Structure formats: structure tokens, C-alpha cells
Amino acid sequence: MATVVNSQTLTERQKAPVEQEQSNACIGSAEREVLQPRVKGLAACACLMAQGDLTRLEPAVRTALDNGVTINELKEAFSQLYAYTGFPRSLNALGVLGKVLENKQTGWQEGKPWTRPAEWDDAKKAYELGKKNQTQLSGRPFNYDFCPQDDYYLKAHLFGDIFAGDQLSAADREIVTVAALSGLDGVAPQLAAHKQGAVNMGNSQQLVDELSAWLCNEGYTLRSKWAKGEPNPYGKYFIGQSYLANVGGGVINVTFEPRCRNNWHVHHKQVQVLICVAGRGWYQEWGKEAVEMTPGTVIAVPAEVKHWHGAAKDSWFQHLTYHKDVQEDASNEWLEAVTDETYDKLK
């Protein structure tokens, strides 16, 4: 039987940064509105900026600019998001944009020139604009009497001063906000509110649903410090798409897209160790109940035990893996696929 241990008991070789458990709302996209490349570009940049993932943000910025997002729109998006992610991540993202622009491509557009909003010079006007925008976004008047300071900041500054800028429409601003919040832990109430707010500000419900699915299915909401790697060369033994990244020392990081799982298999004359580092997945031995894997879960798979592991239906999944107690003539034996009937019993 597999041994499941807490991450605090790892040896030095096994220790690795793990991410908090996340709930990725990956949903199907059949018969849904097609996301335009410009919307995808804004959303990808916002999601990665919110996570502080500057490595992935740089190519995302290039792709966004290639697909019609203007330079000034990205400046506005990264500036707006300081209200949700803080100045450090806002400034870091702007720094990435500046770095990318050092090698500016011919087709990239500046966009409309920036102009100073009149509301910045009239506090009352900014407050009234913010009150109007907040009411539309919330679907009703909103007054946060519990904390008048936050109530004022939200109305006068976020929905007033910031929304007064003309680089992005209100609908675009909510797309950016939903994407950013999708990349953060612990903000489920705000994310839900802004998904509805995105509709109230002019986006269709279908577009918002498709945006959420796309961010998850493309892996933007996989909050992980571990590289996804390249398509798995052993993909014929998997259902769905997976990726491998060699992290050194005999340790491999395996990334599974939602619903992806490997076939039943057996490790002969060796023990396999699995360490979940991001997302949510499953491990199951033949004839046993499946074990849920979340960041910090460690499983030692005994030799000669038939088993499989893979992602949950609604989440990406990453685990590190290596072998120990390896004997002479150790090998892996790949067996039949895990059927949908077996997999779909899991929640």
C-alpha cells in the first residue's frame, strides 16, 4: 500500500516550495463565445502580473502586442491592477513591458495618447463618477458603512480616478480584473463579484465563462514556481496532455492538464515517490479508493503495485517524481488506460 506523508517530513532531497491548494474552475467551452486574441492578451498579462510571474509575463506581453493590444492599454491595465495586487507587482509588470519595448516590433501599436482625466482635479467629480460606476458594477447602490475609509477609496479612487482613464473601456477593465483575481489565492468572494460585475459592465455571460475556462485550460491560473516543461514524450501512455521538466538530481516535474491521467502501470524493483506541488489530482492503486493529492501531499508507491495518477477534472496538477530503492533490472510496465467510467467516479 502507498505511504502518504505530510510535506513537513520530507528529506532535504525532497524538500521543495509548494503552492497552496487552489480551486481552478476549469469548465467546458462547447457552444460558447469565441474569445478574441486581444481579450486573451489582456487577460493573460493580467493573470500573470497578479501572480508576480515575470518569467511567463514577458512572452505574454509580446503575444498581446502581436495580437492588437496597444502599449498604452497594457500600461493602463498594469496601472489599474495596483488597486488589486499592490504597487510592487504593478511596477514590476510595467518594468517587464519596458524591457519588451527595448526591442519594439514594427506592428506594435502605441494606441491613443494618454490624457489626464479631468476627475483628477475635482475630487467631488471623481467621487460621483465612482459612485455611478460602482452602482452599475454591483447592480445596486453599494455603501460600505463598516469602514468609511474603504468605501471612499473604492468610490473616489478605484471606480472614480482609475476608471476615469480612457485607455480601457469599463468592460475591458472588468476583464482585466477577473483575470487578475483568477490568478490569486484567497479572493473567491471578490472574484465571484467581479465576474458578475464584468457582465454588468457590458460583457456577455458567455464571454466571462469562456474567459474563466480559457485561463484555466491554458494553465494561467496554475500558481506554480515549477516549470511546465515540454510535451511529454511518453504521451502515448496518457489520456490528455501532459508535460515533463527535468529539475535535476533525478527529479522530474510532471504537469497534467485538467482530466489528464496516465495509464495503469507498475514500477518493478523500485519505489516511486510523488510530491504534489501545485493544483489538485488523484492517485489510485488497483482495487483501492483514490487518494486526493493537493500541494504538500507525498506518496511513496511501493514496487510491484499497479496504480495511476493524474489531474482532477477541474484543475491542472503538478507533481515531482523520482525513484528510490532501485534494484538491478528495475523497469516500468505500462498497462491499460484508466477508463472514463473509473475516472468520472472521482470528484
Regions picked out by a protein language model, each given a short descriptive name:
Residues 222-250, 263, 332-347:
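A short, N-terminal "cap"/entry segment at the start of jelly-roll beta-barrel domains
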Residues 118-134, 328-347:
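Acidic/histidine-enriched, glycine/proline-rich intrinsically disordered or flexible terminal extensions
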Residues 76, 85-88:
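Substrate/cofactor-recognition hotspot
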Residues 261, 268-295, 305:
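A short beta-strand-loop-beta hairpin characteristic of the jelly-roll/cupin
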Residues 252-267:
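Conserved short histidine dyad/triad with adjacent acidic residue
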Residues 295, 303-330:
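Ligand-binding loop in jelly-roll beta-barrel domains
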Residues 2-39, 50-66, 89-170, 192, ...:
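Acidic, glycine/proline-rich low-complexity segments that act as flexible tails and inter-domain linkers
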Residues 40-48, 74-78, 172-182:
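Short, structured motif recognition centered on aromatic/hydrophobic residues
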